[in-house]
C-alpha cells in the first residue's frame, strides 16, 4: 500500500474540486439567460495577480475561488493621509471617519484628521464579460478588495464567494460589488461583510438584467457610522434604468440604506429577510419603482424611510395581494413585520409599467422565509439544485492588518492616484 502525504492528498482533492466546480441553479428574474463563462474549463488562479488578470481578460472563463485571496498590503498603504470626521461619528474609534477622496467635496467643512488605510480596498477588480466566479464550499474568500463591473460588461455570474475587509473603519474605504452600465449579472450565494462603504452598489449608468439572490449582507462591525455596531452603507441603487430582482437574501445588523434606490429604476424585492436593523431599510427616491412582496422584517426600526421616499412603492399587504396578477401572472405575497415599524407604500402604478423581461418569479409564503433564508443565504450553502443545505458558513474575522497596518507605505503619488481614481467613479 502506498501512503500519500496528507498535504499532497488535500491538494489533490482541492484540485479535483476546482476542476469539477460548476454553477448550481439557474439564473432567474431579470438576470434570466445569464451564462457567465459557459462551458469554459473551470480553473483556479494561483495567486492574487493571476486572479486579477483572469477577471479582466477578454476570454470566457469559469474562475474557481478555492481559497482565500488576500489583497491587503498588495497595493501598499496610505499612511497618515487626509481624512475627515463626519457629524455621524459621535463615538470616536467605534465610529467611521471618512477618507478624503480627491475630486469629491464630500468631506466639506468636516474637521480634518489623518488616517491610515489599505489602497487595495479603494478600487475593485475589474471584471470583463463572460465570466463565472465561483467558490468551493466555504473556502472562497476575497479579502481586502471588491469586484467592479463597468463600461458595458455583461453575462457575469458571481456565486458562493465571501468578500470582506475593505477598510471597514472608514467611509469611502471600498465597495464589495459595484456595477455601472452592465447587463445580465447574477449575484448568488454571496456573503459581504466588513466593508467601508457599500456592500452592493449600482452607479449612474443603467444596469439592466440583474438578479441578487440567496446572499448574506452582514452588517456587524466594530466601526459603525451609526455608532451602534451596525453598518449603515449597505445596498445602493443609483442607475438610471436599473432592472433588479432582489430575492431570498438575508440582510442583518444594518442601520440604513438597505436598500436606498434612486432614479428611473425597477426593483422587485421578494422573500428577503431583514433582521436587527437599527435604522431604516428601504429609502426610495424620486423616479424609482419598487415592488416589495413576501418579505419578513424582524426587529427593523424603520422598514421604509418616510422622510425621503418620493419614489413609487408598492409594499404588498393582505388586502391588495391580488393586484399583482396582471403584472406578474400570479397574486403577490403579503409582507410580514414583527417588532418592526411601518412598511408604507401603496402605489399600484408600479405594476402598470412593470417590465416584461423579469419573467416568471415564484415566491413562498412568509411563514417559510426566515428559516429558508437563514439556511440558504450566503457561502457554503449551495447544496444541490440551487436550494442549498442548512450548513453554517465560515466565520471571517479582521486580519491583524485591520488595526496593525503593514510597515510598507505607499508613495504620495500612488496614494494620490488611488484616491483620485476612486473619487472619479464613486460620488454616491
Swiss-Prot record:
Start-end of Basic residues biased regions: 418-428
Compositionally biased spans, kind Low complexity: 389-417
Source superkingdom: Eukaryota
SUPFAM superfamilies recorded: Pectin lyase-like
Catalysed reactions, as listed in the record: Eliminative cleavage of (1->4)-alpha-D-galacturonan methyl ester to give oligosaccharides with 4-deoxy-6-O-methyl-alpha-D-galact-4-enuronosyl groups at their non-reducing ends
Region ranges (Disordered): 337-367, 383-428
EC number: 4.2.2.10
Compartment(s) of residence: Secreted
Pfam families reported in the protein's UniProt record: Pectate_lyase_4
Cystine connections: 83-107, 324-332
Listed GO MF terms: pectate lyase activity; pectin lyase activity
GO CC annotations on file: extracellular region
UniProt-annotated catalytic positions: 257
Residues glycosylated per entry: 276
GO biological process: cell wall organization; pectin catabolic process
Signal peptide bounds: 1-20
Keywords from the UniProt entry: Carbohydrate metabolism, Cell wall biogenesis/degradation, Disulfide bond, Glycoprotein, Lyase, Polysaccharide degradation, Secreted, Signal
Function as written in the Swiss-Prot or TrEMBL entry: Pectinolytic enzymes consist of four classes of enzymes: pectin lyase, polygalacturonase, pectin methylesterase and rhamnogalacturonase. Among pectinolytic enzymes, pectin lyase is the most important in depolymerization of pectin, since it cleaves internal glycosidic bonds of highly methylated pectins.
Family per record: Belongs to the polysaccharide lyase 1 family.
UniProt cross-references to PANTHER family, sorted A to Z: PECTATE LYASE 18-RELATED, PECTIN LYASE F-RELATED
Name by which UniProt lists this protein: Probable pectin lyase F
Source organism: Aspergillus flavus (strain ATCC 200026 / FGSC A1120 / IAM 13836 / NRRL 3357 / JCM 12722 / SRRC 167)
Gene name, Swiss-Prot/TrEMBL: pelF
